[in-house]
């Protein structure tokens, strides 16, 4: 009896302890506060665990078995570090200059090997094709020709041993499905089999969305619906993978402005008569809430808001509101700002207000860019981890919504000039 109790106690301790740890070392000038670890599901990073800094390090205990891509986010400065997990301890040392990361040293074997593999992959994708073309011009057995041949052989035969690295092996074996090569000979049927039969690491590999994009590129306007229907039937919408793939497809249709497909498969997702998973539920809700004629969900301004006394988006009184999601590092957005500035006073005379939410993480840059902007500005300083991305289905910047006085969406212009043209 005593042995049974002792064994049970040890099992309980094992279940409560970490599967592995992520250890990160960086100077206090980079960050003294919290670091948050994220795991990947499809194309969405999910917050997993956070840790406070102690003795110059963050030690994040990961409580579950996990193999795949990870991300660590530092809220104090908005920086992120990408890494992989093979359910083993990870060790990282950051060389920094203030908030800037100048070098990332991975001290664990898995991330060292993955970094090496990615370098080889880049050379194979970018350098090797150029070398092969040059080789055609110097096929003369000269010293230069022999050097070219040696480098080509090195790249073509430089394979990474992955026997003890299951995630790296999975990534290498299946990366071809997300290589973005439109002339690839992989058929849509092979893609469908890959999505349906691939191992459990597909969801955490970062390959799912680019592979879906490549799958869609192999269809035509005439075949896209039938191929997507085949895919969804094969992956089974009652499964978590099937629902995640449908959620990813809805995001892709929106990003690439495939409105016909978005409407068709949004209707399908909205009318499923069984329980749906979190991501599919979230995107269905977001699309519904940001469709023409929907009332845009309300938002409580942060302490960073300027040029208003209103506490919430709904508290801003105007005949029309132009809601803009942008970023200080987005070149397209920065080209829009002068156009808005030039027309802002004319809009105010028509009782039209502009409300801009920035997906920024750098406080100093945000303040510099917004200092002279007269309209309402706000930011959470969380970059793409901001709540806007999910609530308002923001997939790219700039994104615009035009609201009437009751906050009903009446337009979704692609740029500010398109909105101005409706006022003429």
Feature locations, PLM:
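Bacterial Sec-dependent N-terminal signal peptides
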Residues: 1-24, 424
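N-terminal "domain-start" segment that seeds a small globular fold
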Residues: 274-314, 421-424
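Thiol/disulfide oxidoreductase modules built on the thioredoxin-like
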Residues: 384-424
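Helix-turn-helix repeat elements of alpha-solenoid scaffolds
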Residues: 146-152, 185, 218-226, 256-259
């Amino acid at each position: 009896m005593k042995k049974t109790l002792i064994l049970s106690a040890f099992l309980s301790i094992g279940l409560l302890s970490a599967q592995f740890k992520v250890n990160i070392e960086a100077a206090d000038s980079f960050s003294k506060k919290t670091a948050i670890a994220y795991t990947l599901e499809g194309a969405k990073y999910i917050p997993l665990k956070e840790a406070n800094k102690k003795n110059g390090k963050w030690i994040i205990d990961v409580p579950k078995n996990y193999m795949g891509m990870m991300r660590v986010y530092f809220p104090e400065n908005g920086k992120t570090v990408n890494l992989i997990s093979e359910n083993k301890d990870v060790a990282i040392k950051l060389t920094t200059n203030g908030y800037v990361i100048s070098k990332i040293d991975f001290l664990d074997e898995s991330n060292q090997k993955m970094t090496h593999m990615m370098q080889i992959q880049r050379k194979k994708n970018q350098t090797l094709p150029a070398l092969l073309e040059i080789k055609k011009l110097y096929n003369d057995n000269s010293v230069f020709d022999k050097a070219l041949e040696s480098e080509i052989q090195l790249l073509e035969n430089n394979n990474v041993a992955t026997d003890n690295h299951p995630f790296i092996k999975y990534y290498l074996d299946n990366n071809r499905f997300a290589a973005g090569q439109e002339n690839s000979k992989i058929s849509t049927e092979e893609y469908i089999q890959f999505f349906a039969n691939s191992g459990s690491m597909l969801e955490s590999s970062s390959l799912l969305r680019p592979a879906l994009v490549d799958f869609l590129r192999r269809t035509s306007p005439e075949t896209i619906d039938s191929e997507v229907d085949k895919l969804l039937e094969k992956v089974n919408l009652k499964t978590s993978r099937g629902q995640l793939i449908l959620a990813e497809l809805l995001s892709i249709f929106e990003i690439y402005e495939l409105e016909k497909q978005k409407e068709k498969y949004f209707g399908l997702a909205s009318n499923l008569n069984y329980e749906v998973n979190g991501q599919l539920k979230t995107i269905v809700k977001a699309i519904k809430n940001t469709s023409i004629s929907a009332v845009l969900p309300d938002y409580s301004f942060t302490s960073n808001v300027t040029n208003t006394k209103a506490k919430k988006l709904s508290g801003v009184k105007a005949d029309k509101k132009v809601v803009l999601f942008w970023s200080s590092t987005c070149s397209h957005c920065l080209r829009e700002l002068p156009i808005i500035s030039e027309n802002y006073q004319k809009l105010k005379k028509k009782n039209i207000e502009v409300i801009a939410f920035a997906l920024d993480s750098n406080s100093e840059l945000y303040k510099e860019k917004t200092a002279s902007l007269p309209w309402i500005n706000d930011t959470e300083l969380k970059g793409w981890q901001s709540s806007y991305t999910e609530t308002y289905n923001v997939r790219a910047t700039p994104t615009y919504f035009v609201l009437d006085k009751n906050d009903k969406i009446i337009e979704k212009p692609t740029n500010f000039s398109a909105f101005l043209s409706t006022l003429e």
